[in-house]
């Protein structure tokens, strides 16, 4: 392929990618973070096609399988591989819809098999332990406590938390307004305890020199801008380490714990779906798996037959230990 042809193809691809980006943004209503992830993943495929001198409209299943094998070879995590392949499938469905191609080369493309993994969940005691380690005497102490109480009280995504606005707090009614994925808004109940911690934080917030355009953001950095997601990750990691929690704790762990504890307490699954902002009930149903595990451990721990079985096994072990020690004593004589 001549150099000018390469350049021409690259320019055409840029226009096409821009059109696809608009499609995801407007028709699929993806959030900016999800959109960025889609485009970054697609860029990996485009770089591969450019390197292999393959036209984007003439890609075959073999080409895509070679690309997928390359992801594995360079050590990309299986979950990330699956996400990238899912994004590529979305791109080629778009090409079909807009009549750029007639058949879908990704139809038989498979990603790596991903085992079902339940998310980490904190117990109520672990949540209390993490929050209680926050020193209110420190400069950002009250802010950090308000952040953790809000995450646990409302089950927010970290991006929803960092984008919370003062104008979206309806404390008299006991709700906050949240902008979730795809710019979809929802009202989420907030607990009296979280309201109390936020109100205490607002006193500290009033002393911050707030930068222009950030006046309405609830949670601010010491520089007077809204907190980044990374900052919230660091706050939670630090407090979990101080509390001696060995689990892999993140903002999303608080969200998982919120949903699981509600379900354990008897909350309706549909209500939990609304609070989490899940489009599909199947996404929320992951928490029924967590609840089943909890129920199983409760049955193993407390069912009378299991208690009796454990007692019998313990007695047998003690009898065997006694017999073994008796035999050893005889040998020693």
Language model region names:
Residues 1-333:
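Conserved catalytic core of the tyrosine transesterase superfamily
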């Amino acid at each position: 392929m001549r150099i000018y042809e390469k350049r021409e193809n690259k320019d055409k691809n840029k226009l096409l990618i821009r059109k696809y980006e608009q499609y995801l943004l407007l028709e699929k209503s993806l959030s900016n973070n999800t959109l960025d992830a889609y485009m970054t993943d697609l860029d990996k495929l485009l770089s591969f096609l450019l390197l292999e001198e393959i036209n984007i409209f003439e890609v075959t299943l073999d080409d895509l399988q070679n690309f997928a094998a390359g992801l594995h070879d360079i050590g990309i995590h299986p979950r990330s591989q699956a996400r990238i392949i899912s994004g590529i499938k979305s791109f080629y469905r778009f090409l079909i819809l807009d009549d750029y191609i007639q058949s879908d080369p990704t139809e038989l493309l498979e990603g790596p098999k991903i085992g079902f993994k339940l998310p980490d969940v904190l117990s109520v005691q672990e949540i209390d332990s993490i929050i209680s380690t926050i020193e209110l005497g420190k400069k950002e102490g009250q802010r950090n406590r308000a952040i953790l109480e809000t995450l646990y009280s409302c089950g927010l995504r970290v991006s929803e938390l960092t984008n919370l606005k003062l104008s979206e707090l309806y404390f008299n009614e006991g709700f906050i307004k949240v902008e979730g994925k795809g710019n979809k808004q929802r009202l989420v109940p907030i607990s009296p305890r979280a309201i109390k911690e936020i109100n205490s934080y607002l006193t500290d917030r009033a002393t911050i020199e707030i930068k222009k355009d950030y006046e309405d953001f609830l949670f601010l950095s010491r520089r007077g801008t809204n907190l980044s997601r990374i900052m919230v990750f660091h706050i939670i990691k630090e407090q979990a380490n101080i509390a001696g929690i060995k689990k892999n704790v993140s903002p999303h762990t608080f969200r998982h714990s919120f949903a699981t504890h509600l379900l354990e307490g008897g909350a309706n699954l549909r209500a939990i779906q609304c609070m989490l902002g899940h489009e599909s009930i199947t996404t929320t149903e992951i928490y029924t798996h967590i609840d089943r595990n909890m129920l199983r451990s409760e049955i193993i721990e407390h069912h009378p037959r299991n208690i009796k079985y454990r007692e019998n096994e313990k007695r047998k072990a003690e009898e065997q230990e006694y017999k073994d020690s008796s035999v050893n004593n005889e040998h020693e004589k």
